[in-house]
Amino acid sequence: MRLLVAPLLLAWVAGATAAVPVVPWHVPCPPQCACQIRPWYTPRSSYREATTVDCNDLFLTAVPPALPAGTQTLLLQSNSIVRVDQSELGYLANLTELDLSQNSFSDARDCDFHALPQLLSLHLEENQLTRLEDHSFAGLASLQELYLNHNQLYRIAPRAFSGLSNLLRLHLNSNLLRAIDSRWFEMLPNLEILMIGGNKVDAILDMNFRPLANLRSLVLAGMNLREISDYALEGLQSLESLSFYDNQLARVPRRALEQVPGLKFLDLNKNPLQRVGPGDFANMLHLKELGLNNMEELVSIDKFALVNLPELTKLDITNNPRLSFIHPRAFHHLPQMETLMLNNNALSALHQQTVESLPNLQEVGLHGNPIRCDCVIRWANATGTRVRFIEPQSTLCAEPPDLQRLPVREVPFREMTDHCLPLISPRSFPPSLQVASGESMVLHCRALAEPEPEIYWVTPAGLRLTPAHAGRRYRVYPEGTLELRRVTAEEAGLYTCVAQNLVGADTKTVSVVVGRALLQPGRDEGQGLELRVQETHPYHILLSWVTPPNTVSTNLTWSSASSLRGQGATALARLPRGTHSYNITRLLQATEYWACLQVAFADAHTQLACVWARTKEATSCHRALGDRPGLIAILALAVLLLAAGLAAHLGTGQPRKGVGGRRPLPPAWAFWGWSAPSVRVVSAPLVLPWNPGRKLPRSSEGETLLPPLSQNS
């Protein structure tokens, strides 16, 4: 992809040079050096034939004496030269290119260039330069190319480049610079190409490049940049090519890009973008090529991500292992788009609406994707499809199993239905995620289907979050992104994304761990988890505990001592996440019970805490009923007869609306308070922490939770 003018130009020059024959130059030549007439291209790409003295790789410690007076190009690369005096080069009046790269210079002042007024190109890359003082290149008024890359420069004085008003190309990449000073560029009004990547600068400040009104190509690759300030590119009205390759940009620098309206080539490859959102690339009227490749975190290209790019002809979005979703309406008003490269991603399909939105599209690359050959990709085999597949024999179906490994273009049209289930890509978000307490969490869930699916999330507490939901902590965006602000340990647990349409649904779950894991696998059971007896009564016991962070589920079991000897049943309650107490009821008086709390955590390990408790002996008030089974039986019989009479009376009329008609009577043992003859299970939605006199609880989003329909209300 032609994103950077300078590298391509240099590659073209090298290729063209290799094709032109080298002619011997018959002059007295220094020992072991080669004197020839070679093709040469000026910094403005004009072709010339230059008299060349090649003394590369000769282990020289000084410039050879008695060089031919007509030398135009002097190559001294890969030697051990540490100093160049004026007397060694001053007599070479025609010298236009000097290559001193890969030598041993540590100070630019060790190079005396005052007597080289014709020099156009100077190579000092791959030396040991550490500083550039003011006026370091005085006397080089004609210089157009300066290569200082791959040194150890950590300081450049404000006027280091004074006198270089004709400089066109400056290479400062791969040094030790920590800041960029706009005063450097005040001396370079005609600079067209600046390569300053590979320096771990702290930040690019507003108007850092403002003096460079004629700059056409700017390379900011490999600088560990996390953000670009809104006015960092202010003043670059001539900029055509821009590279942010291999940085740490988590979002597209939209405001900064607005400052370069003439941009034609943009390279954002190898950045940790998670999504390209609406309007991230909008109204860039001259953009021709855009690269969004090799992004490990990229999940989706959302609706209207690319809007009003009238000159865009090629879009590269390749080698993104988690990119599983391109919205059907991701592209709008891209009339000149010809080539769409989407190979080697995690895409299950490319929607027909996406293709139809690109009226001039000629070819698309989808090879290397896990294509699901169903209704969404059906357009590929429709008659009259104008779009050509790049590498069609490598564009294969991954699903369904009976079409696996079959080229997409060879699947019969009738094999693909009109409607299909939603599919959430397994790579859209990881199975588990650790978040520091107090930070924000963002999860992206996307799905393609026909009809278009609805997406919502379910929290560990069972709260359903839809795009219409906007609480204090949670927010769901229309395309399925869940944002949780200021995460606490209470929000840890399983989050489920649900994508559904009229055909069916698909789900995907992520386990969220908040903060440092307090509980690690392999620790002794019960360590850090304690079950306490808060209150004991003749027929119920109140237990409490402190729920550790990152809890996924909590189960409480209890049984009497006789049950442990095989003479009774064990009861089980599945408790909602966040429950801190439970009231065990329907117990026998003066009886020992064994209760155990089992907690499961997000990292798949569990902990167990147990406690013994004994119910109190019933008082006279309790014995009035508790010790007189005959009286209880009479009362129960009376209740049964009353219920039967009431049922017979109601049976003669119509069922009451809104009540549901007749309901079956509960089993007889329920009236005596006896335990069920098998394991008693209390479902999670019907259990809440026991708190006498409590008001109706509310969720973290302010929604009222109904009280449990059990004896623990």
UniProtKB/Swiss-Prot annotation:
Q: List the disulfide bonds.
A: C445-C497
Residues of this chain annotated as glycosylated in UniProt: N94, N381, N555, N583
User: Which SMART domains is this protein grouped with?
Assistant: IG (SM00409), IGc2 (SM00408), LRR_SD22 (SM00365), LRR_TYP (SM00369), LRRCT (SM00082)
InterPro entries with a match to the protein in the record = Cys-rich_flank_reg_C (IPR000483), Ig-like_dom (IPR007110), Ig-like_dom_sf (IPR036179), Ig-like_fold (IPR013783), Ig_I-set (IPR013098), Ig_sub (IPR003599), Ig_sub2 (IPR003598), Leu-rich_rpt (IPR001611)
Question: Transmembrane residues, as ranges?
Answer: 631-651
Renumbered ranges of LRR repeats:
70-91, 94-115, 118-139, 142-163, 166-187, 190-211, 214-235, 238-259, 262-283, 286-305, 311-333, 336-357
Where are the Cytoplasmic topological domains?
Answer: 652-713
Q: Name the species this protein comes from.
A: Homo sapiens (Human)
Q: Which residues form the LRRCT domain?
A: 369-422
Any one Pfam family match given in the protein's UniProt record, by short name: LRR_8
Query: Chief localization class?
Result: membrane
Q: Which domain of life is it from?
A: Eukaryota
Keyword terms: Disulfide bond, Glycoprotein, Immunoglobulin domain, Leucine-rich repeat, Membrane, Repeat, Signal, Transmembrane, Transmembrane helix
Give residue ranges for domain Ig-like C2-type: 422-511
The entry's note on the tissues where this protein occurs is:
Overamplified in malignant gliomas.
User: Signal: present as a keyword of the record?
Assistant: yes
- Where in the sequence is the signal peptide annotated? 1-18
Q: List localization entries.
A: Membrane
Q: GO molecular function terms here?
A: signaling receptor activity
Instruction: Give the protein's recorded name.
Output: Leucine-rich repeat neuronal protein 2
Which Gene3D superfamilies does the protein's record reference? Answer: Immunoglobulins, Ribonuclease Inhibitor
GO biological process per UniProt: cell adhesion; signal transduction
Record topology, Extracellular segments? 19-630
Q: What is the lineage of its organism?
A: Eukaryota, Metazoa, Chordata, Craniata, Vertebrata
